[in-house]
């Protein structure tokens, strides 16, 4: 399953929508996706979204789409 992670790079700053960044990771479940992010980054995670097949197809149309691996 592909998950879209919305995060802030600097955990000490207040989250602002204008500075929210996203990445995509592959995981078997939402808890595993959160665990992967927490173990490999210092990011302030705002939201983790499980993407449907249609959503993945839509996101792949973006030239910047890339599934991050750690």
Swiss-Prot record:
**Any Gene Ontology biological process:** DNA-templated transcription
| Keyword Cell wall biogenesis/degradation carried by entry | no
Please indicate if the UniProt record lists Metal-binding as a keyword: no
What reaction gets catalysed by this protein? Answer: RNA(n) + a ribonucleoside 5'-triphosphate = RNA(n+1) + diphosphate
Q: What is its EC number?
A: 2.7.7.6
Which InterPro entries does the protein's record reference?
RpoY (IPR009907)
Q: Name one GO molecular function term.
A: DNA-directed RNA polymerase activity
Q: Pull one GO CC term from this UniProt entry.
A: DNA-directed RNA polymerase complex
Q: List the disulfide bonds.
A: none
State whether it acts alone or in a complex, and with which partners, per the record: RNAP is composed of a core of 2 alpha, a beta and a beta' subunit. The core is associated with a delta subunit, and at least one of epsilon or omega. When a sigma factor is associated with the core the holoenzyme is formed, which can initiate transcription.
| Family per record | Belongs to the RNA polymerase subunit epsilon family.
What does this gene product do? Answer: A non-essential component of RNA polymerase (RNAP).
User: What is the name attached to this protein's record?
Assistant: DNA-directed RNA polymerase subunit epsilon
Classification of source organism: Bacteria, Bacillati, Bacillota, Bacilli, Lactobacillales
């Amino acid at each position: 399953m592909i998950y879209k992670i919305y995060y802030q790079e600097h955990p000490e700053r207040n989250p602002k929508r204008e500075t929210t960044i996203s990445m995509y990771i592959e995981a078997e479940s939402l808890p595993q996706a959160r665990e992967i992010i927490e173990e490999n980054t210092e990011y302030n995670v705002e939201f983790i979204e499980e993407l449907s097949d249609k959503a993945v197809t839509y996101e792949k149309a973006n030239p910047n789409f890339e599934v991050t691996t750690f």
